């Protein structure tokens, strides 16, 4: 694995060919029947741009005008669906359910078969320009091998030395991509932020509430 990663870094190995070879060696299962029925579609005259802003480990009760005013104001201009449940309480199963709309218990079967979600397949069939930007690496969990398995030149990771720095880099990269993309095609943007997961803030960030922990030791957390 180390040898492969080193040779890939210097361009001596075709990463896509390597992934195809790995997929061929996986123990494929036959118990996955997804989707259950053939998908019926209708012609779309003018596909709309779609943006998903996803924040890992963000507590739902902090989505309000006081705690997150910018996101709150943005949401007031659209539709809010507040009766939906996550398919899991961790990153792997939560993102999995968002794209596949099935429980996270199907993760392994989908992964070994490299089965992409109907949603992503439909976007690509409609010739969407795909802007996939994540702070954390898309290789752990292995979203590059299921959700985004068919996305060419997938952006695997962000540049930065901290969770907050990775989030900033993600935003800057997306802005650059969106400004230079092919405007003749519709766009799907997936922005996956991670700072709440790592409990990290940009330098000089003005805190909203006091007292406030500088860092969190998860092993010492209790109800008090």
Report residues per predicted region:
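Active-site-proximal alpha/beta segments of enzymes that process anionic O-linked groups
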Residues: 1-218
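Short, intrinsically disordered, charge-balanced linker/junction segments flanking boundaries
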Residues: 219-224
């Amino acid at each position: 694995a180390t040898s492969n990663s080193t040779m890939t870094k210097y361009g001596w190995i075709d990463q896509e060919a390597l992934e195809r070879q790995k997929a061929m060696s996986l123990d494929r299962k036959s118990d996955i029947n997804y989707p259950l029925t053939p998908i019926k579609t209708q012609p779309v005259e003018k596909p709309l741009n779609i943006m998903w802003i996803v924040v890992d480990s963000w507590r739902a009760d902090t989505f309000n005008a006081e705690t997150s005013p910018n996101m709150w104001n943005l949401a007031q201009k659209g539709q809010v669906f507040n009766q939906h449940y996550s398919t899991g309480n961790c990153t792997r199963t939560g993102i999995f359910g968002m794209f596949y709309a099935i429980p996270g218990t199907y993760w392994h079967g989908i992964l070994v078969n490299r089965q992409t979600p109907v949603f992503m397949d439909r976007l690509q069939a409609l010739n969407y320009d795909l802007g996939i930007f994540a702070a954390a690496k898309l290789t752990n969990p292995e979203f590059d091998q299921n959700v985004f398995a068919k996305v060419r030149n997938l952006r695997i990771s962000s540049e930065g030395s901290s969770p907050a720095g990775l989030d900033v880099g993600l935003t800057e990269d997306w802005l650059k991509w969106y400004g230079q993309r092919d405007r003749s095609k519709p766009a799907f943007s997936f922005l996956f932020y991670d700072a709440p997961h790592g409990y990290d803030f940009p330098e000089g960030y003005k805190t909203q509430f006091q007292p406030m922990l500088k860092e969190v030791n998860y092993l010492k957390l209790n109800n008090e």
